[in-house]
């Protein structure tokens, strides 16, 4: 028996998230089905995190155990041949049996793309949220500064979050305009349910002039979901990188 670690990318548009759910098409479900076809084993896959329906990944990490004798240099090709075009295994490597894709994570990075054109780009609509009026990126970056560090992010997580400890550490939160796109990059030790999307939704309201940047400090201190902005659409969010 050996433990393998894979880095994968996927277009989350047509999936009901990463985690297996009854009667739903999920990323985990597709991978486990592919593994069963190539090994004949019932293999459980463990991911670094559970992306929601519609959220994409460029650097999702998984691990699984297998007794298969498939050569290491063939694994990527064998699996990709069994997966839909919307899921790609980027790398496969053997790791120590103690490695865990979820519990060993040190840093996660998510990026959110906003199409800031007056008219939406049809070729980007699966991967970016469209905001037609120009955003004040400088104001958004000022606001983002208040969220960096260790804080209770109750105001920035879904009311459906049942985790008691809502303290997380954000190592970096940047807002950058690249051409006609605005990118929000968030790095942290972990994120609550909808946390990044609520942060982005609130920053967009700052960029639209609906909020003052300093309000972010007050919203954070309030520990009240109703004080923050809307939850940004899932399609603009990508799990970019996971660091161990």
UniProtKB/Swiss-Prot annotation:
Which family is it part of? Answer: Belongs to the tRNA pseudouridine synthase TruA family.
What keyword terms does UniProt attach to this protein?
Isomerase, tRNA processing
GO BP term (any one): tRNA pseudouridine synthesis
Q: What does this protein do?
A: Formation of pseudouridine at positions 38, 39 and 40 in the anticodon stem and loop of transfer RNAs.
- Protein name (record): tRNA pseudouridine synthase A
Subunit structure, briefly? Answer: Homodimer.
| GO terms of molecular function | RNA binding; tRNA pseudouridine(38-40) synthase activity
Which NCBIfam families does the UniProt record give? hisT_truA
Which residues take part in binding substrate?
110
Superkingdom, natural source: Bacteria
- Coiled-coil annotation reads none
E.C. numbers = 5.4.99.12
Checking Pfam families in the record gives: PseudoU_synth_1
Q: What class of enzyme is it?
A: isomerase
Gene behind this chain?
A: truA
| Disulfide bond positions | none
């Amino acid at each position: 028996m050996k433990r393998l670690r894979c880095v994968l990318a996927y277009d989350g548009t047509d999936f009901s998230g990463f985690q297996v759910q009854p009667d739903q098409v999920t990323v985990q479900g597709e991978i486990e089905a592919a593994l069963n076809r190539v090994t004949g084993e019932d293999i459980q896959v463990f991911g670094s995190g559970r992306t929601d329906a519609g959220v994409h990944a460029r650097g999702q990490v998984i691990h699984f155990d297998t007794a298969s004798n498939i050569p290491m240099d063939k694994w990527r090709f064998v699996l990709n041949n069994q997966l839909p075009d919307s899921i790609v295994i980027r790398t496969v490597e053997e790791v120590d049996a103690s490695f865990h894709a979820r519990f060993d994570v040190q840093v996660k990075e998510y990026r959110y793309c906003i199409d800031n054109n007056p008219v939406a780009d049809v070729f980007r609509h699966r991967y970016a949220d469209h905001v037609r009026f120009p955003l004040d990126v400088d104001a958004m970056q000022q606001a983002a500064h208040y969220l960096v560090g260790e804080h209770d992010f109750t105001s920035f997580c879904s009311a459906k979050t049942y985790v008691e400890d809502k303290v997380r550490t954000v190592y970096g939160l940047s807002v950058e305009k690249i051409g006609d796109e605005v990118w929000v990059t968030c790095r942290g030790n972990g994120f609550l349910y909808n946390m990044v999307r609520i942060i982005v939704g609130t920053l967009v309201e700052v960029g639209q002039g609906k909020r003052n940047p300093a309000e972010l400090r007050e919203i954070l201190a309030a520990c009240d979901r109703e004080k923050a902005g809307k939850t940004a659409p899932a399609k603009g969010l990508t799990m970019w990188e996971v660091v161990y």
